[in-house]
C-alpha cells in the first residue's frame, strides 16, 4: 500500500481510510498499471530461511520471461530464521547475517536488510542522543560486523511529537546517518521527509 500510495502521489492516510478524491482514482489506476509491469517480486513467507530465499531467487533467475534479481530487500532481518536449533537469538541472527553476506557474494547481488533497533534508543534523554548508533542494532553485533554499510534514518519531528516541551522542529527534514561504510567515509546526509506519502527524498527535490 505504501508503494502504491507513493507512486500515485496520494496521501497515505486518505489511501488507508478510502477518503480519496475523484482525481485520485485516475492516479491510482496509472500507478497500479505501472507497478504491475515493474520487475518487483514480493514474498511474505514468515520465518523464511536463507536456503528457502536462495531457492526462490534461483527460480526467478531461471525464468526466461523475467529479468534476473538485481537487488534483495529484507524487511526485516529479525523475522528470518535459520531453520535450525540454536542456543539463543543472538547466535541465530549472527548465522543469518553471515549467510546473507555469503549469499550476496555467491549470487553477485546486493542485499539491503532492515533491522530493528534496541529500545534503549527510545529512552535517551537529551535532544541529540535519540540518534541511533551501531550499538543500538538489536540482537547481535554481527549485523555491524558483516554489513558493508550501516545506515540509520532519523527524524527530529518523530521525537518532538512525543515531547511537546522539546521545542519546534522542521517536520519536513530527516537525516540518513552513515554509521559504517567499509569502502568510504561515514557522515550524515540531510534528507527531505514527505509524511503524506511516507517517503524520504533528496533535499533539493523536496524544496
Question: How does the language model describe each region?
Answer:
Residues 45-175, 196-207:
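P-loop NTPase motor core
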Residues 20, 25-27, 33, 38, ...:
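Sparse, context-dependent recognition of short Cys/His-centered cofactor- or disulfide-binding micro-motifs
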Residues 175-179, 192:
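C-terminal helical "lid" of AAA+/P-loop NTPase domains
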Amino acid at each position: 500500500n505504501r508503494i502504491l500510495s507513493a507512486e500515485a502521489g496520494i496521501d497515505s492516510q486518505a489511501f488507508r481510510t478510502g477518503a480519496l478524491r475523484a482525481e485520485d482514482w485516475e492516479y491510482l489506476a496509472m500507478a497500479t498499471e505501472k507497478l504491475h509491469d515493474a520487475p518487483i517480486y514480493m514474498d511474505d513467507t514468515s520465518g523464511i530461511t536463507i536456503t528457502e530465499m536462495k531457492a526462490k531467487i534461483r527460480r526467478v533467475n531461471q525464468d526466461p520471461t523475467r529479468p534476473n534479481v538485481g537487488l534483495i530487500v529484507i524487511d526485516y532481518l529479525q523475522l528470518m530464521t535459520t531453520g535450525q536449533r540454536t542456543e539463543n537469538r543472538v547466535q541465530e541472527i549472527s548465522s543469518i547475517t553471515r549467510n546473507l553476506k555469503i549469499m550476496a557474494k555467491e549470487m553477485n547481488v546486493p542485499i539491503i536488510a532492515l533491522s530493528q533497533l534496541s529500545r534503549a534508543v527510545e529512552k535517551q534523554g537529551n535532544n541529540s542522543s535519540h540518534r541511533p548508533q551501531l550499538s543500538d542494532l538489536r540482537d547481535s553485533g554481527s549485523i555491524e560486523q558483516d554489513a558493508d554499510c550501516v545506515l540509520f534514518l532519523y527524524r527530529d519531528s518523530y521525537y518532538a511529537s512525543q515531547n511537546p516541551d522539546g521545542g519546534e522542529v522542521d517536520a519536513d527534514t530527516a537525516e540518513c546517518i552513515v554509521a559504517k561504510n567499509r569502502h568510504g567515509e561515514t557522515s550524515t546526509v540531510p534528507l527531505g521527509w514527505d509524511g503524506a506519502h511516507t517517503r524520504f527524498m533528496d533535499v533539493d527535490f523536496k524544496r
